[in-house]
């Protein structure tokens, strides 16, 4: 019996093409692209609720991989997540489950849950007004990282060390309708560790800012290096992934200069693997599909 797997990613994207390539070694697994932006639901027009994108019936798939979550309005994002929940209720297996995507995409919820489960994270606060942000800036030592509460790849992240410059940035965020996620800056050696978890498998890389800066995202120009994680790093990453209800997760760890144990910076429920696959020389896409096939087989 063929397993039909939909991937929420454009056909032109590297990750979809890599999954398509890997699927060719499976005789009983087919991969197709699903368009997040055209997902639709129809109720009362047949015997049951039906789900489509612009080209196919989604409820006819066996599994769905959430590879990307495109930006959109509040209505669009809520509807897309609601549809994922209903597609899952209709019997389509979703990787990662919708609830894990909801948790991990929200830095406040994700990190507060990890803190509640004794997972070490940087001190942070989330506020809604400029005056609260200025007070928090001072409480966190006058050296903070301001991030979008929903965001990825190091975009729109600012390190703030001057109160006037910080206030100006806070006013900009508030004017744009954003809440203010303020994390205490963690001094480190310009590198961090990404641990990629796919079921029982683990992959890892070290990301290095060769220019000596503090941002380590590969998307922002840092270099990926091969890395063998310690068992304690793997255990910490797995605990973080489980707290976020993730079966597939990218977990970022950073070592403060004044500590020997790492902190969890964040958990990504739809992690990319292009950089990590290049440096670890393992077929990550094949592992993703093997995990899906094994899960579907029970």
Summary of predicted features, one role per range:
Residues 1-6:
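Extreme N-terminal starter segment of soluble prokaryotic enzymes
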Residues 114-115, 137-156, 177-188:
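ATP-grasp fold ATP-binding core
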Residues 10-123:
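Conserved N-proximal alpha/beta basic substrate-recognition cap immediately N-terminal to
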Residues 69-71, 150-151, 270:
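Short glycine-rich anion-binding loops that position phosphate/pyrophosphate groups of nucleotides
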Residues 215-262, 286-298:
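A long amphipathic alpha-helix within ATP-dependent nucleotide-binding catalytic cores
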Residues 268-281:
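Glycine-rich phosphate/pyrophosphate-binding beta-alpha loops
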Residues 155-244:
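Phosphate-binding site of ATP-dependent enzymes
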Residues 117-141:
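Rossmann-like NAD(P)H-binding beta-loop-alpha module
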């Amino acid at each position: 019996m063929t397993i039909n797997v939909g991937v929420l990613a454009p056909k032109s994207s590297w990750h979809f093409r890599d999954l398509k390539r890997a699927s060719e070694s499976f005789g009983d697994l087919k991969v197709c692209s699903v368009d997040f932006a055209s997902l639709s639901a129809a109720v009362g027009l047949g015997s049951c609720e039906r789900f489509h994108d612009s080209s196919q019936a989604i409820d006819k798939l066996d599994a769905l991989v959430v590879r990307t979550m495109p930006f959109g309005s509040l209505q669009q994002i809520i509807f897309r997540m609601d549809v994922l929940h209903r597609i899952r209720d209709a019997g389509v297996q979703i990787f990662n489950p919708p609830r894990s995507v909801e948790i991990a995409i929200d830095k406040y919820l994700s990190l507060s849950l990890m803190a509640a489960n004794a997972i070490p994270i940087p001190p942070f606060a989330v506020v809604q007004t400029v005056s609260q942000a200025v007070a928090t800036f001072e409480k966190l030592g006058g050296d903070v990282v301001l991030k979008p509460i929903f965001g990825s790849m190091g975009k729109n992240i600012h390190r703030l060390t001057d109160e006037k410059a910080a206030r100006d940035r806070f006013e900009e965020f508030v004017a744009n309708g954003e809440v203010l996620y303020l994390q205490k800056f963690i001094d480190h050696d310009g590198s961090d560790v990404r641990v990629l978890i796919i079921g029982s498998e683990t992959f890892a890389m070290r990301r290095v800012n060769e220019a000596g800066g503090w941002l380590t995202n590969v998307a922002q120009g840092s270099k990926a290096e091969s890395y063998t994680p310690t068992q304690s790093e793997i255990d910490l990453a797995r605990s973080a992934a489980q707290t976020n209800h993730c079966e597939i997760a990218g977990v970022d760890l950073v070592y403060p200069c004044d500590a020997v144990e790492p902190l969890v910076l964040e958990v990504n429920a739809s992690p990319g693997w292009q950089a990590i696959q290049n440096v670890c020389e393992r077929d990550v896409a094949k592992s993703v599909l093997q995990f899906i096939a094994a899960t579907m087989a029970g």
